[in-house]
Amino acid sequence: MASKESKPSRTTWRDMEPPLRETWNQVLQELVKRQQQEEEEQQGLVSGKKKSWVSIDLLGTEGKDIKKVNIWEPCEKWFAQVVWGVLWVLQIVLWGCLMWEVRKGNQCQAEEVIALVSDPGGFQRVQHVETVPVTCVTKNFTQWGCQPEGAYPDPELEYRNISREILEEVYKQDWPWNTYHWPLWQMENMRQWMKENEKEYKERTNKTKEDIDDLVAGRIRGRFCVPYPYALLRCEEWCWYPESINQETGHAEKIKINCTKAKAVSCTEKMPLAAVQRVYWEKEDEESMKFLNIKACNISLRCQDEGKSPGGCVQGYPIPKGAEIIPEAMKYLRGKKSRYGGIKDKNGELKLPLSVRVWVRMANLSGWVNGTPPYWSARINGSTGINGTRWYGVGTLHHLGYNISSNPEGGICNFTGELWIGGDRFPYYYKPSWNCSQNWTGHPVWHVFRYLDMTEHMTSRCIQRPKRHNITVGNGTITGNCSVTNWDGCNCTRSGNHLYNSTSGGLLVIICRQNSTITGIMGTNTNWTTMWNIYQNCSRCNNSSLDRTGSGTLGTVNNLKCSLPHRNESNKWTCKSQRDSYIAGRDFWGKVKAKYSCESNLGGLDSMMHQQMLLQRYQVIRVRAYTYGVVEMPQSYMEERGENRRSRRNLQRKKRGIGLVIVLAIMAIIAAAGAGLGVANAVQQSYTRTAVQSLANATAAQQEVLEASYAMVQHIAKGIRILEARVARVEALVDMMVYQELDCWHYQHYCVTSTRSEVANYVNWTRFKDNCTWQQWEEEIEQHEGNLSLLLREAALQVHIAQRDARRIPDAWKAIQEAFNWSSWFSWLKYIPWIIMGIVGLMCFRILMCVISMCLQAYKQVKQIRYTQVTVVIEAPVELEEKQKRNGDGTNGCASLEHERRTSHRSFIQIWRATWWAWKTSPWRHNWRTMPYITLLPILVIWQWMEENGWNGENQHKKKKERVDCQDREQMPTLENDYVEL
């Protein structure tokens, strides 16, 4: 009874019931009803006062003309019409600009901006992806240890677009490769599961069929999801372009990926969670695999010209050089040899970073014949190479424990008795539910290939590397000027491997086929002189040359022991042509054993590598969620970056007191205008904040209810599983006792039997040891029920409080309207246009006065330029013989002479030249703001000419006499900045 009294009641009162969801028609009817009530009221809340708020006429029922104050009454009618027209034109221009911006496809839409953190893109790029927690989401979550579907949003329905500008600013047109640990963890679980049950699998027969077949075959599909504060950027459009072209060899050091369109999601696409090595994948993965066939960007590349490079550019995903497929932290997953086809290091393993760029794409098998590439029957002596490519995996392939033919229509299927996971093999027998001998046409296949010379940006054709004794001097067969970066500058007239001395000083090997087609160029910075000195130092090569002899298609040198030099295994120079001595584009002087420049593989990938490739279209980012309050905008948007966005700093003049008075007056007007709305806004914010907080509390309470319900459901499920286990136990015991297969007794929950051991091991008695009793389970259910009832009541109360607070918001406005006389408070608002017009007029008058003041100041400064007219008296030479002169004695060596001061008036052209020179040397000429003052120069010239020559040009200067002695002439100061007239 005590438990029943303490048990909370499940009944709720009527106000706790959540309101039904209103439809749009109900909302519209309520608005119309309120409008009609407002129309019936002839007066406001205060008697005798008009309503001060604005009502919206939705249905057009308000037809009465309300007398309004015309703010343009004092103005002239034409002035009002002009202003009205200008406003309309401005509005049309603004709308046109808005529509033009919206129609631009590469602009950032409003819903595409993520302003979450203080960085340009609204997110932070996560480089160490191994530190990011991840979980899987699948349908059979209880069986495979994943989260249920719906725990994370569907990426196809809920996503956020990222603009192209943000992608370029964050990733710098470089979508990097990431070695995700999530597929490695799945691979580790599969390996651990196989090792723990390896002994049991060896004893199985062909009658064994388990649900684990779906996991092995990759039919358990799910998504990888990252929790908050992480997210995934899913690329929707991308292309590749070369970077860091080696000027010596011509190969591209890097192939970068430029993603131009991406979405922010929480989960990846669906993919098989775990599987073993296979060849043909499910058709559900075709679109995802096809997306990795990345095309070249629309830039000027030689491979894009079909005439120069048949077949176009390479398509696929370039795994960069230096990538680690299995990092050092998980090196125990590496096998002795690579099981990933062409994805291998220089030693054929995965212990070192990749030394050559590896391309992975979905294979196009439309041109194949019987599971073999085109022209496969034309290969020489049954080799695996054709058209410069060595093929691996053509013939029989390993697919889910079976050897099947590479021909999808062949239907060949042989069981091997083992599964391949990474670099290890595990014996395992199972009877698959799928038909192994079916027609696999239409199922996607991975194609792994490597361009060893890495010149994908020049051509997609693979060539067979030339032997050194087949490299000869061209002798006129090569014309033009070309290099390793410019293959189109030369022309060839004969097939062969021509040694060419380029104009840049290095050596080139131009590979010419079909008499006129250049299929490749290999180069080095070593010049001809250095090479020839090495050649002459070779034994018995003093009288030899590299001239072409023989009648073969490619030609050869005369002496095979005196071919193009190279370094042997001891790093010493030699000229002997060996059987496996080829020349490579990236190793001109080394001994290269690889005959073909390309390597291709079909299949050979397990689920780990399959997931790794599909995950390359995703990048992990770090974000933060929106919160209540003000959202902090990114700092980069607040600061103007770059020289083009920086405003020029100018020295400010002293502000007079009138400016401060005007500023204070404007601030007072603005403060008065916002005083009335400030009180109402404060009250509304207070009630709104309370309502939002109540809604948040209600949401939190409902979240607790959901968590308690989920815990209760889990507990119920646990009880059901216990019940199922016990029933299964009883059924097993009954069956065994009926058929007399078991004769045992129990002792402390353990079974002691004298029958066959395999029968006793079939019943795992220890799994039922720690099961709880039904009384304990009932008590826990009762506790869950009581907790859930309390939480439901608390949630209902919080919802009721939130609804009450939300209904109080309009009541606050009515209370304020009843308390204050709003109509009289805002009666002065009708004079605001006049005040604004007055302020604008004062500002315009002030600007005009400033312009006039500047013009007057400039006029005075230019007008003050004067030219001093001086008379230079040339003294007569001194008579040393003391001869007596006619006009004086000359006893002191100087004479008193009288000269007429002759002055000539300057012409208009002279005045103009002097004025123009003064303008050119003044600082006003270098400032664009003072350039308009140049229009005043003609007026100044005319004014000065009139002052000098008079209004009629008849001013006469009187002749003056001036006595100048020697002392005065010697002590005359130097004239500076004056024009001297002789």
Curated annotation (Swiss-Prot):
Coiled-coil ranges (or none): 689-738, 779-814
Covalently attached lipid (S-palmitoyl cysteine), positions: C855
Region (Fusion peptide): 657-677
This protein's UniProt keywords: Cleavage on pair of basic residues, Coiled coil, Disulfide bond, Glycoprotein, Host cell membrane, Host membrane, Host-virus interaction, Lipoprotein, Membrane, Palmitate, Signal, Transmembrane, Transmembrane helix, Viral attachment to host cell, Viral envelope protein, Virion, Virus entry into host cell
GO cellular component: host cell plasma membrane; membrane; viral envelope; virion membrane
Gene Ontology biological process terms, A to Z: symbiont entry into host cell; virion attachment to host cell
Site label Cleavage, positions: R656, G657
Residues on Extracellular side: 107-831
Region (Immunosuppression): 723-738
Signal sequence bounds: 1-106
Cystine crosslinks: none
Intervals, Cytoplasmic compartment: 853-982
Posttranslational mods: Specific enzymatic cleavages in vivo yield mature proteins. Envelope glycoproteins are synthesized as an inactive precursor that is N-glycosylated and processed likely by host cell furin or by a furin-like protease in the Golgi to yield the mature SU and TM proteins. The cleavage site between SU and TM requires the minimal sequence [KR]-X-[KR]-R.
SUPFAM superfamilies: Virus ectodomain (SSF58069)
Glycosylation sites per record: 140, 161, 206, 258, 298, 364, 381, 387, 403, 414, 435, 439, 470, 475, 481, 491, 501, 515, 527, 537, 542-543, 568, 697, 764, 771, 787, 821
TM segment ranges: 832-852
Coiled coil keyword on record: yes
Subunit structure as annotated in this protein's UniProt entry: The mature envelope protein (Env) consists of a trimer of SU-TM heterodimers attached by noncovalent interactions or by a labile interchain disulfide bond.
Function: The surface protein (SU) attaches the virus to the host cell by binding to its receptor. This interaction triggers the refolding of the transmembrane protein (TM) and is thought to activate its fusogenic potential by unmasking its fusion peptide. Fusion occurs at the host cell plasma membrane.
The protein, known as: Envelope glycoprotein gp160
Organism: Maedi visna virus (strain 1514)
